Amino acid sequence: MAVLFQDRAFADDGLWLFNNPPAKQLKDKYHFTPTSAWLEHIQKSSVRVGRGGSGSFVSPDGLVLTNHHIGSDSLQKLSDPTHNYLADGFYAHTLSEEKQCPDLELNVLQSIQDVTERVNAAVPPSMNAGQAFLARNRVIADIERESQNTTGLHSEVVKLYGGGTYQLYRYKRYTDVRLVFAPEKRIAFFGGDPDNFEYPRFDLDICLFRAYENGQPAHVENYLKVNPQGPSEHDLVFVSGHPGHTNRQLTVSALTDLRDRVLPFQLQTLYRREVLLAAFGAHSLENQRRIDSDLFGIRNSRKRSDGQLATLLSSDFFAARVEDENAFRSELENQPALRPVLDSYNRIDQAENEMMKVLVSGFLLEGDWRRGGLGFDSRLFRIARTLVRAAVERPKPNGERLAEYRDSNRAPLELQLFSPAPIYDDVEELELSDSLTDLAARLGPEDSLVKQILAGKSPGERAHELVSGTKLKDVTVRHQLYEGGAAALEGYSDPMIALATLVDPAARRLRRVFEESSETEQGAYGQIARARFALKGNEIYPDATGTLRLSFGEVAGYEEDGKAVPAFTTFAGLYQRANDHQNREPFDLPPRWIDRHDKLNLGTRFNFVTTADVVGGNSGSPVVNEAGELVGLIFDGNIQSLAGDFAYSGEQSRSVAVDAAAIIEALDKMYDAKPLVDELVAGKPLSR
């Protein structure tokens, strides 16, 4: 069932690199060979949307198709008490009506260059973990800065195969991105949380943005023509997107820690946040508007994490992983030249042990740098931490900074820091109060740092003091403090800045433990990867890294509980499901879908499933046919696909997509968006 690297010749699994496509598998099973021109066209038509979504150019005038739930953050930020675009939808009838998103960026991969030799040359085996981490950071920062200065393209060095190879990805960035179209949430997310990660589905989970350059719609040479017929059953299709993260190459001991420690901690936090936001949103429609996007994200993460934990708790799954690892270790034992690689497993165990010692405090005080530590769930705190750390990091040599403050990451960081998106005091206080309560409960009320953080007050009182007292809601103040650096912060009286300064030394120490342990793991996983290359060749794919990948498969239904699940659903099925639930939430249709149902061809295919391998991050990915035409839009996977974080199984695991036929039919018949239909189908020049 599971292998460290998926290499079965006739399976549809794989998150393949564009510079190492599954040519043999495609030729052997589907008699299709992608040309270099075909691959380049798909690559340069694909778009990374924001920090965790996918999309594609679908017209020569910069029109980008992605999911409603990927666009929901922008929809919420553009909304106000009188215009709820997330709930009610939006359509710009003219270019002048397209709304500029406050902090959304699009990235399009232009080139890939192998830099493994240069990275490895900078990290000799004699270095300890701390030295190796610093040396690797320095050389990666140098490579990224040189590339960006030479090409003008945003440049990222990507670690693949756990450190087996390093590749330089260069992107064209668009930061002037405008909203063009979004349907109502009730049809984009029809069925709500009960239907999430389920199939059959009936969702118009689409959103259209437009990239601009110099104040005008961007002209792009590579875009996907939309095939209004959509796919047929058993068609070969491809998915080009940005899968976020998988753990298919983890050792058994690392998976054990994930099962027993990491996922339970994350789930406790997610359940807590879900209850908090759901209760807040239930008080009023305005409350619901303010937290709608965040609540969706939390529920989505909770359901996905539940599925991942269920997979790891399966004795059959774990037995298969143990068997697979033991078989590979035996191969290494029988190869004298590769036998030393066996020690890599011990080094991974040691590194995991070090990280598990500080797991809880690390998540609470540091966490993912984008989230600012789970103990401080506040956008204002994240802004304060960015300002405090920028004052320390920016004066350092580029290669010695924390990764997010390198020159290559400056533009994305500043886009978020100076976002004019609204910040709501009541939401800030709610989330910060609850996360401070969680922090105190987990670390203990007598912990010296906890006492300093709360400053003798209850979590609610402290959160109110911090949120009401800070000046960081003012973007002008952020600019002044960021540009002024340490001199501007010194003596500056702001409670949120003071809190970020207080917590920073402890958070940095914890981050260093994780980074040095990860460095040890990286070297060990790299050795394992190179050993697998030696035994299996390079027809294997790496774990997902949030970078562009190509998946393939066929449009196909499956069997569940002895019943056939068809590959397609239709508009007729949508109305039947709403009727079965008496049009009650979350199976209630927007008024226009009731009033105008007679305009639709109810036999139009709505959603479909494919065996193509996708995971979180693939949302918004185009589904393309052999001709390179867009025939669908990935928006979910079924419940069986949640095991895909650890292994792929084509028997029941399916990715779920909106059919291109449904997109065209809905735009035309429900929304009277004929100009958009013409732009999508015929690539007609803008005339709006």
Task: Describe each region flagged by the PLM.
Residues 3-688:
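Terminal presequence/propeptide segments associated with secretion/organelle targeting
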